[in-house]
């Protein structure tokens, strides 16, 4: 369940509720999903930073600490309570009923924590967002790299033109490389400096399910178009302890044809092997129809009682990248290599565009806007888009639209064209957690064609 929130700000030196209570603050209604800028615009405190020189006039926003407060109803039940911040941008500390329950420092994954029992029917949630770069120092190795690039460019351009503000790595605040947040936030060649901050998604308080279920659908082989071998891998987490159980999986085609399978769990996982006759394959829109199957999963105990379910959509397709030598290449120092996407055994003419964030304020982008953007890509006859690594991961709505419209996605991990502090273990731990979350989130989208290391 979610609830309305209010917003106020403080000096960054105020770091806990005691310090906040000692100051005088005016609270305003918060725009959630959205962020601090959206809230201040709605309240008439700042003008939209896109207009005139208001980008400069609202620069103070990134130097303040921002606080959200709200009262969230507690759902009925006896299972443990789980607090989820579905969109966190970026550095946050969270209190529930006066108790600190967690710290978060990434724009690229949600915050979730299991709460201790609460003897009340509501939970008072307080969230402090620190200035995004507060307390961070620029990595020395990154500074050395940028200086070397700058020296090279200055030598190549005798007129010694100054780099434009927001022109990429030469004007970037290099401390930003230590923070898992879209690098475009601090200015790029297409973007002003407007680092977003705040709650970009709802705050939810739910009861944890005794059994958590996840699945992944993998097309193993397609036989001359008249059959397909599909593996459905199902994983469970039993919070009340392990118990013997089985899984039933059903795939339903767009025409309503069903194929089912059954398997026994072992160590929390099971794989159901299915063979589909005359499968309706997923294609890019220029090669065919992007057909999607309904996936229904049922977990049963030893007495055949249903104890958990899961569902989703899947596309039956194989995809690979042909990197074989190009024997027709005339280069004298050896042949070049192909880089061709092969979908269901057919080469794809990849044509499209790079996707940068639709807004400097990602929390204000709606699912409908994502859907309309993908439809426009299809109408422009694109077959592939690349999610650029200096921005943010694409939303579920965007990826679902790519599945439906038959658009492949080349996906960068969120790293821009700059060195990152790979020797910082705290940073690397955050990156590993992020990568695990994002790859699992996107794994079942048939539109996902490739993961790339970054920009």
Model regions: which residues?
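Aromatic-lined substrate-binding rim segments of carbohydrate-active enzymes
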Residues: 384-429
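Secreted/periplasmic carbohydrate-active enzymes, especially glycoside hydrolases
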Residues: 1-385, 393, 404
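Ligand-binding grooves and catalytic loops that recognize ribose/phosphate and carbohydrate rings
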Residues: 423-442
